[in-house]
Regions:
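Alpha/beta enzyme core
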Residues: 1-20, 35-37, 41, 54-179, ...
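A mid-to-C-terminal "edge-of-domain" accessory segment
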Residues: 8, 232-401, 441-448
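A glycine-rich helix N-cap at a beta->alpha junction
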Residues: 45-50
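Short beta-alpha connecting loops at secondary-structure transitions
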Residues: 153, 207-214, 226-236, 295-302, ...
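Catalytic alpha/beta core domains of metabolic enzymes, predominantly
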Residues: 155-158, 165-282
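A conserved regulatory-domain signal marking ACT and ACT-like small-molecule sensing domains
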Residues: 374-385, 403-416, 420-458, 469
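Mixed-charge, glycine-accented linear interaction segment located at domain edges/termini
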Residues: 460-495
Length: 496
């Protein structure tokens, strides 16, 4: 929507991106609306996108091109064909007509006081097919007044070495304008090809945050920007905002950033194996090529059965300050961690459950209540369920029932009802994510499941885990751990 686009434009502007292409007025209603607004930018130049005029038409007779030129945006991107085969087989016109289309369309825009970026579609494939004609299309754009010639790997199959060689030739051929690069990621090399073009002299880079785009996506700016800034090719980018802005865009576009994404993924600076985590604890940069904070991310030390002593101490010290002196306790915790991971538990993302487990092993229970039992019923075809739970706080036992949309929702409501009289602060706590994974699917209906629950109090987020052959039991255990953690005395200290 236009509102979503405004939010993305504002986020990219905060990051310091130099140009923000917001869409095609005349084709996209949201872009049409934006073209009439004052955009929320202080550093970025808004760019409207469109195509050259249709064959057989003069530019001022093409409704879409005229609408593009009439919008108040001072900079336009015009895309035109640079592949002779595409001109004949897709545009269904002759090569000279395509050159006329390019030159006159660009000239029409520049005569109307627009700065034109010319995107040469299918340029690298076109250059390999007919290099002389591909270069002629660029020359036509320059005659029309284009300030930037963007070489497009539209099919996403070009190799970095070829991109570098061809880009260098074009930079030498057209010294009077800037040369740009626009790569798709169909062969997984869009970032590498973009860097190759920059090394060859390209000074205008096109891409998308998180690589969002058709098919396999475009060159990923969340990966490219740190590389370009560190190499000294780009200035004005506030890299400390990279991860927050990437996550803002992901939220707006309703996509999930893969944990393994460089720089901005949740796992980009996560350390699990014993030697790696131990090295990070002793020397912060020993297993990281950049400081996580420099790109707005954070370091995470993940718990697993490979965890070494130093990692266990680092994770447990906020709750058990003398843990470093308790060698026997550390051994028991490490042994329990291995046994429970073998049973299907995972504490990499569920550190809150690990704290609860460690307290019980050390005979220093951090829990404030004891879950006694639960039941869940569903007596109709409707999704609504009824759950009953019982807890004990000191010498007092309390039971409560609640209805919910599904068993987990009902269980959560019943547990909260039980605890509110004892712990009013629980009212601020809410479940925000619930995931289930079958651990051993070959066991079919007897397979164990792992439930991972994410909870927040509005300030902090924590995760807990439960494992059982009964999904309701696994959910109940994960919910119990979540509330145990929220009520622990050192909760705030743990989050710093």
């Amino acid at each position: 929507s236009s509102v979503d686009k405004l939010d993305v434009i504002a986020a990219l502007d905060r990051l310091g991106v130099h140009y923000t292409e917001y869409g095609a007025p005349g084709f996209d209603p949201a872009a049409e609306k934006l073209s009439r607004l004052t955009l929320p930018v202080t550093r970025s130049v808004p760019v409207a996108f469109g195509m050259t005029c249709k064959k057989g038409l003069m530019p001022d007779r093409d409704e879409n091109l005229r609408a593009l030129v009439e919008c108040p945006t001072p900079t336009l991107t015009l895309v035109g064909k640079s592949h002779a085969l595409q001109v004949r087989d897709v545009l269904k016109t002759d090569l000279d007509e395509n050159l006329r289309i390019i030159e006159q369309s660009v000239a029409y825009a520049t005569k109307n006081d627009k700065t034109v970026i010319f995107d040469a579609e299918h340029f690298f494939d076109g250059y390999r097919y007919d290099a002389e004609y591909a270069v002629k299309t660029l020359a036509a754009a320059v005659r029309g007044g284009a300030k930037v010639l963007t070489l497009c790997d539209t099919n996403g199959g070009a190799l970095p070495d070829d991109v570098k060689e061809i880009t260098a030739r074009i930079v030498e051929r057209f010294p009077e304008v800037r040369i740009g690069i626009h790569c798709h990621n169909d062969n997984g090399l869009a970032v590498a090809s973009t860097l190759a073009a920059v090394k060859a002299g390209a000074t205008h880079v096109q891409g998308t945050l998180l690589g969002i785009g058709e098919r396999c996506g475009n060159a990923n700016l969340s990966t490219l920007l740190p590389l370009l800034v560190r190499a000294g090719y780009v200035s004005g980018i506030d890299l400390k905002l990279l991860t927050p802005v990437a996550r803002t865009v992901a939220e707006i576009t309703n996509i999930t950033i893969p944990d393994f994404y460089p720089y901005v993924g949740a796992g980009a600076f996560s350390h699990k194996a014993g030697l790696h985590a131990d090295g990070i604890l002793k020397a912060g940069g020993s297993f990281e090529h950049v400081d996580p904070a420099s790109v707005g991310n954070i370091r995470q030390l993940l718990l697993s059965k490979e965890a070494g002593k130093h990692l266990l101490i680092a994770k447990l010290k906020p709750f058990f300050p003398d843990i470093a002196e308790n060698a026997e306790g550390l051994k028991r915790i490490a042994r329990a961690l291995k046994e429970r991971e073998d049973a299907g538990y995972t504490y990499e993302a569920a550190e809150a459950s690990f704290v609860i487990l460690a307290g019980k092993i050390l005979d220093r229970d951090v829990t404030r209540f004891e879950p006694i039992g639960y039941s869940v019923t569903n007596t109709s075809d409707e999704p609504e369920c009824t759950a009953s739970t019982t807890i004990r706080v000191g010498d007092v036992t309390r039971s409560a029932s609640a209805k919910g949309l599904g068993p987990v929702h009902a269980l959560d409501k019943a547990m909260r009802e039980c605890m509110l009289n004892f712990f009013p602060s629980i009212d601020k706590v809410s479940l925000i994510d619930y995931k289930v994974r079958v651990i051993n699917p070959r066991s079919a209906t007897g397979a164990a499941v792992r439930v991972l629950i994410t909870t927040t109090d509005g300030r902090h987020i924590w995760k807990t885990v439960g494992v059982s052959e009964d999904i309701i039991r696994a959910s109940f255990d994960a919910l119990s751990d979540s509330y145990h953690f929220a009520l622990s005395d050192d909760f705030d200290f743990y989050f710093g």
